[in-house]
């Protein structure tokens, strides 16, 4: 009898393990909006992918926005979306970016409007539900990617839009302009006088065609101070390691 119970328990554990693994794979798949490559500061390519697309790790550092704009104009690139990380509100990450970021997820507004100037924000459905933020409400972000209480009290964000649920990581994000993030982390009097000093966290890229899948990352990794990482390749490696 005991052996039968142990066998049933073993099968149950295996089944649950497979189920959890499958759910995790599905989540990673949904969170990547068919991006081909991520460019960011040198370090762990997996860390770069996890932090920039799945928002479950810390970034590898920052890169020059001036250099990022050059990469977006490369003949191999169809489009690029810059992102800047570093702050949160109640543990929900604040992402500085442009409006192409929302198009990656086919995002639609539930209520309100898109941001039009610095310190305006659009929030995901889960953020709205759990923080109780509403249109025209103000909030202040905290330094870092987890809530430490070290807040930017001098410059609050205003909620101007709430997104419809997407079933992706976007539901857990607060989206604003790059200018908003730069304003908070730089000397505002000098920020736009010296655009060469502006930085972002990463660049999310889509190729014009798949022939660039090997040549473009090699170009970035060998000839620049940045790294290029394939989201699909890094997540595939992760699941091979974890079984």
What name fits each language-model region?
Residues 88-99, 107-188:
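Hydrophobic secondary-structure segments that place a key small or acidic residue at a functional site
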Residues 14, 18-93, 103, 117, ...:
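Hydrophobic, regular-secondary-structure patches
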Residues 83, 142, 206:
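Conserved residues at the C-terminal ends of beta-strands
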Residues 1-24, 239-243:
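Hydrophobic alpha-helical transmembrane segments of multi-pass inner-membrane transport and secretion
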């Amino acid at each position: 009898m005991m052996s039968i119970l142990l066998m049933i328990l073993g099968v149950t554990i295996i089944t649950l393990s497979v189920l959890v693994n499958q759910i995790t794979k599905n989540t990673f798949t949904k969170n990547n909006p068919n991006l081909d490559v991520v460019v960011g500061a040198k370090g762990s390519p997996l860390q770069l992918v996890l932090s920039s697309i799945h928002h479950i790790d810390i970034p590898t550092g920052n890169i020059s926005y001036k250099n990022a704009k050059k990469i977006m104009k490369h003949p191999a690139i169809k489009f690029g979306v810059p992102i800047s990380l570093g702050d949160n509100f109640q543990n929900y990450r604040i992402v500085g970016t442009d409006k192409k970021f929302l198009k990656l997820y086919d995002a639609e507004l539930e209520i309100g409007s898109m941001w039009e100037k610095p310190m305006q924000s659009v929030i995901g459905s889960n953020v709205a539900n759990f923080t109780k933020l509403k249109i025209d409400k103000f909030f202040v972000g905290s330094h870092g990617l987890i809530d430490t209480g070290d807040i930017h009290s001098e410059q609050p964000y205003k909620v101007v839009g709430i997104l419809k649920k997407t079933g992706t990581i976007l539901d857990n994000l607060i989206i604003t302009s790059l200018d908003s993030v730069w304003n908070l982390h730089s000397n505002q009097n000098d920020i736009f006088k010296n655009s060469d000093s502006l930085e972002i966290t990463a660049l999310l890229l889509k190729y014009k065609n798949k022939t660039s899948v090997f040549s473009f990352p090699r170009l970035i990794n060998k000839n620049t101070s940045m790294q290029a990482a394939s989201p699909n390749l890094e997540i595939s490696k992760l699941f091979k390691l974890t079984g």
